């Protein structure tokens, strides 16, 4: 499981996240996927989650299982409440996002190589999950900070950390060169 220790659902539920996309990214670290299911049976509407184990490439393996077979705390209603709780917590404590943002920005300044970026972030306790189009373009970037137990879509941290900014950063013509250190004259 991506080099992570054995986990329990309690470990995942400690993380703060504000959207289904952020929750998906967190689950992917533990080789778990999620499908949202909605429908109607006998005139009664239902809404829930179905979880599946995945292999290292994100392909489902084995049979999916309903959230209700695990625990109420991982069902659709509980997770949606978690989104609202997390949004409130992030609004009240801006430090959570600032810690992650500053760490990611510092690492981004060190390299134009995506693999090196991922490696340096991991050393700081942050995982990044990139989502790619069929032709390899980055269309999503989510940062999972294990230090603050917070999950953020890149655009939530700032325009400079959005998927488009990441795509541009990692495909610039000078991607194989070392970044030029920023120097500010002393008289400023």
Where are these regions (language model features)?
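Extended intrinsically disordered terminal tails
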Residues: 1-188
